[in-house]
């Protein structure tokens, strides 16, 4: 087969997904397409590497060496073996998935478990439900995938990674309301990586990693800057089982081998610990779920990992619980983070005491207000909060505010950051100086004088001098935040009577 182009790869992957249209809801595409893509890829790479061993030393030599391959496929569990089946195809796929998962356990490295395919194909029940996935539908998708050889020679890891990320984005477009659970706008993620500037040999962590896009973009930063990236250790935790599997497949298909992705509730059961403390990392990126109400506040109030040093957040908003988890996960010397949050964390009265303590810690480095519509199913503007445990001397006692709400483009109903937007914002963070109507360095004393408010508009007047402009998305978001706070207060009062 001829080498596949990146555009052909994207096109054929999406056409395979569209075989499911009308059969299942669009939000469920990822449950089937990602495992099949991963299965096809590892089967073709296995064949490619096995053929190299045969050419090197013959069939017997290849059989011995196949046990040392990065991913092992047991006899009878290859893509071609499943392709030959015409009845109960879903059940046969499940058997192959389980056999491959069991044949590839995680390995131990530096006292932790790395890689491994246990559970990577995600939930299995849907495959054997013939009402949802009849044999002819599964066979059609398998035949569609079989048109191309997805070996490393035909499709290098970086191109496969691009195609996978493309598919994640397409599924987000199609999934609508559920997209934000697993996908963060990649141009925003690229900005966060540019601000934090990952380095070789560092440990990078995302406590709510979704499909792994923030981790991938951090490695892309190193690749794009010509720096060594394979020495980077990658860690993530994701509460959704299918989504954590998608993240692991994403990392594998991007050529990443040194990673640990855990499935579980980060607030209740943090996966990465060191004795009685959380493990710490050089760099943390996160887009925590916004203002969730269903979380174990009572356990956090007596958190055994010491993550409530600012206080215990209200039941109706877990934002500062995630914030404190992230701060506790930062290395004291090299630790830095970039977090996507709703603007409310900057000014809500119910979190005032926690915000005051945060300001006094002097780890806040930059607060960036970004444009509206950059998130699926959310028209609101958000902010990026950058913290550093060990701020440079000239930044101590000061915080940089950036008003980047106008640094956004929109095309085909999709909002995104252009390269020039990313460059402008990232350079402003690095220079840490005033820019008229865009950036302002503010002392902690001045923040105290402003009642410890951290909202960007408190410190930067970006309005037109000749017009009284009302920013409707910002005003609407502020109204929503106030309404939610009022509702929470009413609920609290009602419990007293």
Set out the residue ranges of the language-model regions.
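Non-catalytic alpha-helical coupling and interface elements of nucleotide-dependent molecular machines
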Residues: 38-44, 150, 168-172, 223, ...
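Short small-residue beta-strand/loop micro-motif enriched in glycine and branched aliphatics
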Residues: 172-175, 229, 409-410
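Non-catalytic, mostly N-terminal accessory regions of nucleic-acid modification and defense proteins
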Residues: 1-200, 262-271, 369-372, 396-403, ...
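Conserved S-adenosyl-L-methionine
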Residues: 178-286, 291-299, 306-308, 321, ...
């Amino acid at each position: 087969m001829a080498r596949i182009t990146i555009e052909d790869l994207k096109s054929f992957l999406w056409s395979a997904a569209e075989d499911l249209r009308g059969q299942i809801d669009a939000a469920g595409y990822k449950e089937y397409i990602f495992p099949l893509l991963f299965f096809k890829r590892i089967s073709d790479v296995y064949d490619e590497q096995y053929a190299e061993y045969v050419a090197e030393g013959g069939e017997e030599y290849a059989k011995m060496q196949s046990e040392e391959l990065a991913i092992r496929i047991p006899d009878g569990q290859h893509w071609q073996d499943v392709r030959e089946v015409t009845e109960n195809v879903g059940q046969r796929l499940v058997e192959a998935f389980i056999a491959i998962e069991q044949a590839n356990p995680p390995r131990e490295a530096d006292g932790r478990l790395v890689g491994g395919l246990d559970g990577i194909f995600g939930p299995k029940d849907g495959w054997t439900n013939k009402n949802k996935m009849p044999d002819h539908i599964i066979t059609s998708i398998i035949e569609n995938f079989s048109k191309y050889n997805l070996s490393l020679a035909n499709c290098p890891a970086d191109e496969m990674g691009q195609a996978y990320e493309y598919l994640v984005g397409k599924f987000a477009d199609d999934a609508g309301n559920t997209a934000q659970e697993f996908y963060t706008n990649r141009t925003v993620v690229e900005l966060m990586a540019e601000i934090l500037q990952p380095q070789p040999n560092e440990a990078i962590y995302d406590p709510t990693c979704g499909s792994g896009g923030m981790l991938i973009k951090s490695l892309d930063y190193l690749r794009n800057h010509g720096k060594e990236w394979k020495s980077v250790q990658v860690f993530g935790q994701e509460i959704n089982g299918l989504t954590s599997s998608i993240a692991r497949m994403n990392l594998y298909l991007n050529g990443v081998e040194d990673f640990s992705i855990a499935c579980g509730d980060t607030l209740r059961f943090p996966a990465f610990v060191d004795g009685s403390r959380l493990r710490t990392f050089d760099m943390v990126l996160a887009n925590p779920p916004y203002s969730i109400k269903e979380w174990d506040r009572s356990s956090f109030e007596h958190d055994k990992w010491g993550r409530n040093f600012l206080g215990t957040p209200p039941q109706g908003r877990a934002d500062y619980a995630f914030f404190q988890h992230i701060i506790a996960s930062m290395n004291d010397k090299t630790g830095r983070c970039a977090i996507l949050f709703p603007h409310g964390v900057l000014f809500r009265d119910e979190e005032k005491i926690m915000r005051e303590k945060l300001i006094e810690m002097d780890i806040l480095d930059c607060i960036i207000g970004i444009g509206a519509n950059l998130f699926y199913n959310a028209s609101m503007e958000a902010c990026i909060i950058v913290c550093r445990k060990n701020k440079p001397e000239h930044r101590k006692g000061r915080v940089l505010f950036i008003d980047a709400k106008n640094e956004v483009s929109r095309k085909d109903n999709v909002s995104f950051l252009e390269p020039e937007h990313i460059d402008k914002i990232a350079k402003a963070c690095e220079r840490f100086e005033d820019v008229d109507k865009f950036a302002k360095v503010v002392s902690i004393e001045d923040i105290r004088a402003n009642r410890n408010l951290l909202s960007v508009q408190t410190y930067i007047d970006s309005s037109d001098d000749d017009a009284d402009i009302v920013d409707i998305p910002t005003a609407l978001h502020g109204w929503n935040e106030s309404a939610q706070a009022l509702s929470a207060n009413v609920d609290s009062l009602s419990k007293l009577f």
